Amino acid sequence: MTILICLAGATGWAGSALARGIAQTDDIAIVAAVSRTHARRILGDVLAEPGLTCPLYTSAQEALAHPCDVFVEFTKPEVARSNVLAALGQGAHVVIGTSGLTDADYAEIATAAEDHQRGVLAVGNFALTVVLLQKFAEIAARYIPQWEIIDYAHADKMDAPSGTARELAFRLSKIRPSELSVPLEQIQGEVETRGARLTGSQVHSIRLPGYTISAEIIFGLPDQKLTLRHDSGSSAQPYVDGALLAIRKVNTFVGLRRGLDNVLDLT
């Protein structure tokens, strides 16, 4: 049975790569897509991919006039929440690849998913190495009480911290908050230089030319430290593989789940 999807952000870096990946599958089809830049054109014409014959629309609300099984969100954080809620209202399951959504946004989305009895899979980063980084960090946090998170990205990335860093901090908050030897209120000097306190973790965001996407977490004990790091290359292929898996699995549960590991067997 073919999974019909609506793809928001279809001509962006990740969305266009996913669209091309979908064109190579025989069990997923794009019935409508969103691209404000190329609205009213055919997706395949824009991407030079003849097999993609769906129309492009300005908004998710327009695109959702086409019935779909799964709505895939790859736009911007300022519109992602409303797009997801609209898709749930139309009875679609949702895969979220957009970073920058807050815990408050996710709380609202979780409620809507339960109300509509649909699955939502939110993945800050679809790469397998990120999934493993998160798992290894959760193990380390049980034994090492102090850590800090650093995310690196190109100079033009608007959201901070990255979805990967935000998701990592959220996951570790379920284990315990990172201890601070010197409480923030006792810092002498500019406290902002210690980073942001996000769900119990100190998080630092670096935005400079020369970076693509990297995430790092450093755990510290007396006379020893542990560093876990993920680095992305310029190809979107790791994200495509993860997103295809998410599309195929998001209808297997009800409610919000955060992280690709929720549909992987990592036991």
What are these regions, as identified by a protein language model?
Residues 1-5:
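Extreme N-terminal starter segment of soluble prokaryotic enzymes
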Residues 6-8, 13-65, 145-267:
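C-terminal substrate-binding/catalytic lobe of Rossmann-fold NAD(P)-dependent oxidoreductases
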Residues 24, 65, 89-91, 115, ...:
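Residues at the C-terminal ends
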Residues 30, 56, 94-95, 119-120:
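Hydrophobic beta-strand scaffold residues
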Residues 60-62, 66-89, 100-105:
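Beta-loop-alpha module in the N-terminal Rossmann-like domain of NAD(P)-dependent dehydrogenases
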Residues 85, 90, 98-120, 136:
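Rossmann-fold NAD(P)-binding glycine/threonine-rich loop
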Residues 132-144, 160:
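Rossmann-like NAD(P)H-binding beta-loop-alpha module
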